């Protein structure tokens, strides 16, 4: 059975993936998705994640860019880019989620919608980001 938190992460990744193609309709897509969510806890978490990623997007993108080896941010697939964005947000800003959980979940989402290679790529990048940017308290969760 898939956890509610996995569903939440997938929804946020999908929303930012859609943003790549429908940039001008982001608020509309966000509102439509939010209105479809029945569980109030998931709804609140979804809103917090989306707003957190969106408001910290340039910082998150810079962090990701700085951890790409022999690769540029623009070369990332839309899927990998947005999985990394959500994963980076969660590593840095969601205090009570263990690093290993975040990385594992993002690997699984990357593999589900991409490929085995996407999962390996996401693992390497998020691991480097966690070591340098995750709050020190998260290493003890």
UniProtKB/Swiss-Prot annotation:
Give the record's GO biological process terms. DNA-templated transcription termination; transcription antitermination
Keywords (A to Z) from UniProt: RNA-binding, Transcription, Transcription antitermination, Transcription regulation
The record's InterPro entries line, in alphabetical order, gives: NusB-like_sf (IPR035926), NusB_fam (IPR011605), NusB_RsmB_TIM44 (IPR006027)
The superkingdom of the source organism is Bacteria
Q: Which Pfam families match?
A: NusB
Q: Which GO terms describe its molecular function?
A: RNA binding
List the record's Gene Ontology CC terms alphabetically.
cytosol
- Entry function: Involved in transcription antitermination. Required for transcription of ribosomal RNA (rRNA) genes. Binds specifically to the boxA antiterminator sequence of the ribosomal RNA (rrn) operons.
Q: Which family does the similarity line name? A: Belongs to the NusB family.
Query: What protein does this entry describe?
Result: Transcription antitermination protein NusB
- The species is Fervidobacterium nodosum (strain ATCC 35602 / DSM 5306 / Rt17-B1)
């Amino acid at each position: 059975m898939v956890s509610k938190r996995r569903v939440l992460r997938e929804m946020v990744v999908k929303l930012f993936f859609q943003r790549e193609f429908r940039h001008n309709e982001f608020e509309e897509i966000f509102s439509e998705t939010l209105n479809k969510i029945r569980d109030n806890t998931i709804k609140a978490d979804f809103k917090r994640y989306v707003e957190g990623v969106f408001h910290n997007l340039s910082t998150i993108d810079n962090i990701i860019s700085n951890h790409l080896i022999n690769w540029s941010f623009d070369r990332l697939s839309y899927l990998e880019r947005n999985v990394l964005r959500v994963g980076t947000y969660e590593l840095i800003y969601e205090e009570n989620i263990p690093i290993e959980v975040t990385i594992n979940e993002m690997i699984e989402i990357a593999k589900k919608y991409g490929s085995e290679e996407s999962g390996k790529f996401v693992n390497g990048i998020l691991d480097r980001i966690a070591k340098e940017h995750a709050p020190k308290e998260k290493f003890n969760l």
